[in-house]
Amino acid sequence: MATKKKTFEEAIAELETIVEALENGSASLEDSLDMYQKGIELTKLCQDKLQSAEKRMAKVVTDAGEEIPFEADGE
């Protein structure tokens, strides 16, 4: 079975579904643990995609050809 890489938006949507299901509290302990584990994996995927986007943004070049460093707030 081929696995398609999720987009950031798909991962966020699935993560939101998992959070809603966990907040509902009707799943069994085993199902809750499985959903929690999947949620952690999706969170890591989203973080990786955001870091990748941040690196791409950092390489934006000005008209003079100078790199504009990207600095996150609070860093």
Curated annotation (Swiss-Prot):
Key words, A-Z: Cytoplasm, Exonuclease, Hydrolase, Nuclease
NCBIfam families on file: PRK00977.1-2, PRK00977.1-3, PRK00977.1-4, PRK14064.1, xseB
Family the entry assigns: Belongs to the XseB family.
Signal sequence annotation: none
InterPro entries assigned: Exonuc_VII_S, Exonuc_VII_ssu_sf
Functional summary from the UniProt entry: Bidirectionally degrades single-stranded DNA into large acid-insoluble oligonucleotides, which are then degraded further into small acid-soluble oligonucleotides.
Name of the protein in its database record: Exodeoxyribonuclease 7 small subunit
Gene this protein is translated from: xseB
Organism: Listeria monocytogenes serovar 1/2a (strain ATCC BAA-679 / EGD-e)
